[in-house]
């Protein structure tokens, strides 16, 4: 029996108060020096399947002192960092595309926490010494190896002691999108979700992320693909820590380096680059590599102080589930924070208003990118994110990677169901699952969990496992052959819903009033029909689509299918500003625009012929 090895390292600490040193993060004015000394710890319970010897342990612990106090940093390998079909792509000098599937099972990127501290977290690379950050007593500390010959010394320091690379505030290029005032947010927070909505929000969600590095950034790192790979791995590892509070798990499914030349025109005008990258994802990337979201890291200096841009509320869309980020700092944590910010826009989160705040430090969705990395989501962002998920329900985030898709050597007894295992309830001493054989990680009977599993056996065929949640949903029943409830199914498109106020469309009942509430908060209604007539030729509120930058007015019959108009108090004809997201503030597809008619492609057509 091979047991999981826990490693404890003791650090001798020598504070260097007031001294200065140049590290990878830049010039650090105050730091402590520690010398790791590896000490084997007592074996931990758990049964490990036979496997080849690995360079890095799955679980490690480090003991050291911070400000003279001993702490224990617990680390676990980020098992979800790479998807099984993770690939790396670069280009030969003659332009040939070269794609490989490198072995990433034995990687060196970890998440963790300080022992006995509930609010702690860590993201660490252990590839060549210890590099990353950890949160201790509400403060963030950074650690990295000191490049001294014949020495295992490391530096520990705070962000406040790192000299800023420049004093110019960095900004996001998304404009005219700000979280609503406190009043709507408070009203929303007081609303009670249905049990089905609560279940949906609590389900783990997954994003398979594809990262592209442009030619400028490649050359900025001396055309060293290994250096870029390590930098991107660190960024995505950190990105995961930031998104765990939202119950999102991000797996890197591909990394592409434009080593020969850029595959699109990358311009200083960030909106142009974003549009080109979205088109490239749709026409070139998706046909050869599946992904839920793609981000472009570029070495170009965007116009002004802008360092990133993304579409808002567009996750899973072929041309718009994208973001572009300037590699604006030597510090991976700073760029990772910008990646988190732009991904937040894709997830329907707008910029925080002045009334939004975070428990500690800056907020991720502040319009100004903070000089302090590793920020967190505000309560405003959480509310907006949940509202977006419940309104749009993007499907690509629910396809959890199979147990074979998350790459790691299988360990029976570590509570993770991995390749070759049917269940994993911990060690035989700890297992509380009567359906699982802890010694073999095999099921005793049919199943151990799932909506269609009862007392370790499949429920009989026909047993309802998911009730219809509304007029546009259908109930699901167990098949008798699986522990999982069948995939959610919906009423046919065009089925009347909500007392004939609308027609079902892709499992939802799109009604203009609900769309107004989603954008403005409770107490808002759709404008009267005369508003749509009055605003028909208004350049801001009366168009149906934008072609080559020109707003095309709606035809008379289609006036209810263009810009959404809402009523709030005495304001009867409110429309929403045009943003980089072409669908923001527009009437949703499938919305009822008359008796027996629905909006499709911004046109009001007969429901019988629409689907």
Curated annotation (Swiss-Prot):
It is found in: Secreted. One of its GO terms (molecular function) is metalloendopeptidase activity. GO terms for biological process: proteolysis. Disulfide bonds join 316-396, 356-380, 358-363, 412-441, 423-436, 425-431, 435-456, 447-453, 452-478, 465-485, 472-504, 497-509, 516-566, 531-573, 541-575, 544-554, 561-599, 593-604. One of its GO terms (cellular component) is extracellular region. Ca(2+) 3 binds at residues 473-474, 476, 488. Its cofactor is Zn(2+). It is an enzyme of class 3 (hydrolase). The keyword Amino-acid biosynthesis does not apply. Ca(2+) 1 binds at residues 208, 292, 396, 399. Its EC number is 3.4.24.-. SUPFAM superfamilies: Blood coagulation inhibitor (disintegrin), Metalloproteases ('zincins'), catalytic domain. It holds the Pfam family Reprolysin. Snake venom zinc metalloproteinase that may impair hemostasis in the prey. PANTHER family: ADAM A DISINTEGRIN AND METALLOPROTEASE DOMAIN, DISINTEGRIN AND METALLOPROTEINASE DOMAIN-CONTAINING PROTEIN 28. This is Zinc metalloproteinase-disintegrin-like MTP9. It comes from Drysdalia coronoides (White-lipped snake). The lineage of its organism: Eukaryota, Metazoa, Chordata, Craniata, Vertebrata.
